């Protein structure tokens, strides 16, 4: 994985060898069939690719085709600007905004690793989709 700043966005981009396992970890087959996870966009959104190669962003919660937005920039080919404060960390809202969490409250923000992030995204999406059903 490579990560760092690209313009005003903090990106975490997965290596091609990681994409399949990361896509499985986020259970995209359940919520976005036919898409693969390419990376994270400023911690709040996944960057996903469809089977035609088009790139989109989608909120981590809720995951669903109705929330896809075409990515408005090309993924950088040049190195990202590293930021040691964030290497290996993903910002997570303890109570996601969708569930009434405050995005500016310091006590609602936690920094987790990639594996924890996958687990949290899956758990909260399961909660969202079960309530929606």
Q: What kind of feature is each model-predicted range?
A:
Residues 1-91, 95-133:
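Nuclease and nuclease-like effector domains acting on nucleic acids or nucleotide cofactors
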